[in-house]
Amino acid sequence: MLRVRGLSFSYPNGKLALVDFGLAVEAGELVVVLGGNGSGKTTLLRCITRTLRPNAGEIWLADTNLCSLEGEKLRRARLELAMISQHASLVRRSTVLTNVATGALGRHFGWRTALGGLPASELKAARGYLTDVGLTDLAEQRASMLSGGEAQRVAIARALAQRPRVLLADEPVASLDPEACQEIMRLLQRLARSEHLAVLCVLHQVELAYTYADRVIGIRDGRIAFDLPRGQVSREAVRRLYVGEAA
C-alpha cells in the first residue's frame, strides 16, 4: 500500500535528516517507528505527506508516486493519506460530531457547501465513525469538554471521515496518561485490521511498540537501523537508537 524508496532529505542549513530511507506498510498493518530526538521520524512523515519535498527518492501510494505529482493531482492524491499528531487540534466551540464530519472536507464536499451547513450524509457517516472509536454518546458535546484521550479519539474519527487508505500518526499518545495511551494504541491496531488501513505510527514509548506493532522500524541519524517483526526486535537494538541522547 505505502512504499518509500531511496528517500533523502536535507534542510537548508545542509543537515541531512533522511538518507536513502526505505519502508513498506501494507493494508491492515500497524508499523511503529522508534528513534531518538532529531533522528528523522517527523521529517519522514512530513516527506510522505509532501509537506516537505524530498531531495531524492520515491513515495508510492499503491501505483502512484507522490514525488512525481504537483498541484491539483498532488492535492487529490494526498486525500488518501490522513494524519494525526499528539495535539488533536479540534475546533473547541464546535460539537464532536461537527469536528468529525469536517474530515470529509475536500474529498466529498467543499467549503462552499460547508458554509451552508454540513451535508446530512456526512453527519450520518460521522456518527458511524464515532461509533468506531467508542464515542457515540458524545456526538453533541462541545469539543472543549473532552479529556485528552477523548479528543485524540475524535481526531482519529475525523481522520477516518476522510476515507484514507493510509493513516500516519506522529506521537499520537505523547501527552496522554498511561491508560489513555493503551486505549489509543488498541484503537489504532483494531482500525488497521477492521478498516484495512496501512498505519504508520511514530512513537517514543518503546513498550507500546512491543505490545501493539506488527513491525518496528528503528531510525538513527536519518537511516534505518532495523526493520523487523516486533518479536524479533531486541532490547539492545532499541537501546542503541537512543545512545547519546541527553538523559
Label each region the model flagged.
Residues R163:
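Conserved catalytic motifs of ABC-family nucleotide-binding domains
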Residues R142-L146, E150:
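Conserved ABC ATPase signature
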Residues N65, H108, T113-D137:
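Conserved ABC ATPase "signature" region
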Residues T49:
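Helix-to-loop junction immediately C-terminal to a conserved catalytic motif
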Residues L34-G36:
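The feature captures the beta-strand-to-loop junction immediately N-terminal to the Walker
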